[in-house]
C-alpha cells in the first residue's frame, strides 16, 4: 500500500493506492478532511469498431457515507441524482480530452463517495481521483490533472472552501488543471468582474499543482508500464491528396453558405460526389477501409478549412469575429401561463415559460446532509425536431441536465429571496431550433420570461457562447458561435452575466499556452457581446412587470408569534384544514411564525388572513373585548377573549356593587364585556367587568350628549299650492 499527502487549502489531501479494489486496472482512495472517495478505472482489452472514445463516468454518493438510510421504498440508492449527474459530467469533461486519439476501448471510471464530511464536497476530489486512478494504471492517459474549488470570502480567494465559507462566498468555481494549462472550468458568481475571474483562475491553477506532484510520486514508485493498443490505420497520403483534390473546392463553397440547412445539404452533396468519383477512379481498389478513410479525410478537410478561414479573419456567412447574430424577442406569447418568452438568435430559438408556485411546490432533494429544498428550478429540453432529426422522446439526458444547470446557475442569484418574493419559481426552456448556443438562449429567454411573470429580478441576465482558435501566433476569438464552430476551437466557453459582472461560466480548454492576456481578451469580448444582447432584450421588456399574472397564485405573508402556531394548526391539523376547506387558499406555516397564504382568488386570501388573525390575536392592556365565560370559580370567572387566550375576572371586578357569588352575575357560556387591566410576565391576563361597563356607559353618555347639543332641524315649509 502506498499513500501520499499534501495540504491544499485548510485540509490535507491524501491519495492511497493498493488497499481497496485491487482487481481494477487503477484504484485509489482520495481523502480530504473526512470526505473519502474510492475511484476506480477499468479499460477493456478488446477494441470497438468505432471512431470515438467509449468512456463512461459514474459519480455516486453512498448515503451510508453520511450515516443515512435512503428514504425510498426499497431503502437503497437508485438512479443518479441531478447532483451526481453534474459531478459525473465534471469528471468526464476533465478526463476525456486527455485520452490518446483513436483510443476506442470501452473505459469506465466510477467515483464513489464512501465517507462524507459535511464541510468538504466530494465532486472536485472525484476529478483528482479519476486522474490518479488512470495515472497509476496501465491505461493510456495524458495526465495527471487535479480538481480544485475556488471561492472568494471577504474579497480573499479561498482554495477548497468549507460549506460555511461557501455560504459567504460570492464565487464558486470548480476547475481541473494540468501541469501546463487549465483544462476545465465550471462555476457561478454574484456579478464578478472579468478581471477578478481571471485572477481566480490563476489562483486555482497555481494552488492545485501540489496535487499533481502526489500523483507523479505514486506513478514513479509503482512504475506501471502503459499498455500498447491498436491505433487506427494511418491514412495513405496518396488517398488524402486525391480526396483533397476532389472535395476541397466544394467544402470551401459550402462554408460560404450562411443558412444551416442549405450548408449541410451542400457539404453532404460534396462528400457524396467526392466518394463517388474516388470509387470510379480506384475501381476494385475502393475497399470498405478506403471508404472509411476517405470519409475521415473529408471531415479532416472541413476542420482544416474552418480553422484556416477563422484565423485569417473569415467566418461562416461572412460574419465578423465579434458580431452577434440577429436577435428577436417576444414576451407574453402564451396567454394562460404565468410568464413566457421566445428568444431567437440566428437559427437558435428557445421558448421559455415561467410558472409560479407556493412553498409546497419546492423540490425536495435527498442529500448526504439530509433533506434539502429548492425553490428555483430551470429545466432544459432539447427535442429532436430542433435539429431536424427523429428520435424517441425519453427523459432528460446528461447534456440536458448540464445545460439546464448552467442556465439555472446564471439566473439563480438574480431571483429575489423568499422573504421578499415568497414564490417557488420553475422555468422550462424548450429549444425549438438549434444552431449553437441553445443554453445561452435559455438564459436570455429565461430572463425575459421571469420579467414577463413579474418576478422582480435584481438585474437582467444574458449569456453568450464563445470560441477561441490558436494557430501559431494567430489567435481568433469568436462571439456567438454556431454549431459548426462549437467543436472547432481550442477553447470553448460560455459566459453569462448582468451589465455589472459574471454570474455563470463554463470553459473547456484543449491546448496549453493560453496566457492571462489571451483569456482576458476573450472574456472582454464576451462582455461586449453580452452587453449587446442585453440591450436587444431590454428593447422588448425594459423591466419586470409590476403585477404577476392573474392566473398565478397570490401569496401574502404574515407573521405570527411562534407560540400561536398551535392555535392555527389545531389538534391533528383540524383548524388549518378547516381554514383551507372554507377559503380554498393554500397555507404554509414555518417554525419561525411566518405564514404564507396563497390563492389565485384575492378574496380567499383575505378571508384566510382574517381567520388566522382571529386565532392569533393578542390582548392589549386598556382595550375592551367581548369574551365568553368558560369556567366559574369561587374567586372569579375565566373568560375566553379569543381562541387560546383566556383571562380572569376576579369577583371584586365583576360589579361596582358587592357580589356574594360569581354565579349571581355570570354563568358558563355567557358573553361578557371585559377590559384588560394588566398582563403579567408569565402572560396571565387580569380582566375587569366593572371597568368595562363604566367606560362603555361613559362613552354612551358622551354620545347622547353630543346628539342633544345638535341644533334642531328647520321646520318643513308648507307647499305653496296648499
From Swiss-Prot:
User: Any idea which positions bind Mg(2+)?
Assistant: 486, 492
The keyword Protein biosynthesis is annotated on this UniProt entry: no
Q: Which residues form the S1 motif domain?
A: 622-690
Tell me which UniProt keywords the record has, alphabetically. Cytoplasm, Magnesium, Metal-binding, Nucleotidyltransferase, RNA-binding, Transferase
Give the protein's recorded name: Polyribonucleotide nucleotidyltransferase
Q: Which InterPro entries match?
A: ExoRNase_PH_dom1, ExoRNase_PH_dom2, ExoRNase_PH_dom2_sf, KH_dom, KH_dom_type_1, KH_dom_type_1_sf, NA-bd_OB-fold, PNPase
Its Enzyme Commission number?
2.7.7.8
Q: Gene encoding it?
A: pnp
| Native organism | Myxococcus xanthus (strain DK1622)
Q: Which Pfam families match?
A: KH_1, PNPase, RNase_PH, RNase_PH_C, S1
Q: Which cofactors are reported in the record for this sequence?
A: Mg(2+)
